[in-house]
Amino acid sequence: MKTLVLVAVLGLASLYLLSYASEVQQLSRDEEEFRALVASFGGLFDTEERGVDKEGCRKLFGGCVGDGDCCLHLGCKTRKLPPFADPYCAWDWTFGRK
């Protein structure tokens, strides 16, 4: 009787391990499909394409001389009051790609 219970427990343990291995293999297939899907967007998620990390551009509230100094969707702005006359990069009210 004890042997039969031991064999049953070992059988259940082996079935658990087999099903777990199958699930892990399925997850790796899903991960490969997800990576292929992201790659099919053609670099939509690349930050360089959107101008975020353009070399030499000024980020929000950074100093600037002209609009060309600021990153994408930012323009060189200035305040009218003399203490705040230093130009800075601010949002130019545009969306999407330019």
UniProtKB/Swiss-Prot annotation:
Top-level taxon in the UniProt lineage: Eukaryota
Propeptide part(s) removed at maturation, as residue ranges: 22-50
> What cystine pairs are annotated?
C57-C71, C64-C76, C70-C89
Expression across tissues: Expressed by the venom gland.
* Principal place of residence: secreted
Which residues, if any, are the signal sequence? 1-21
Where found, per UniProt? Answer: Secreted
Its transmembrane ranges are none
- A Gene Ontology MF term for this entry? toxin activity
Q: Which InterPro entries match?
A: Huwentoxin-1
Cellular component terms (Gene Ontology): extracellular region
Which of UniProt's keywords are assigned here? Disulfide bond, Ion channel impairing toxin, Knottin, Secreted, Signal, Toxin
Give the function comment from the record: Ion channel inhibitor.
Family designation: Belongs to the neurotoxin 10 (Hwtx-1) family. 25 (ICK4) subfamily.
Entry domain remark: The presence of a 'disulfide through disulfide knot' structurally defines this protein as a knottin.
Q: What is the recorded name of this protein? A: U11-barytoxin-Tl1b
Q: What organism, scientifically named, is this protein from?
A: Trittame loki
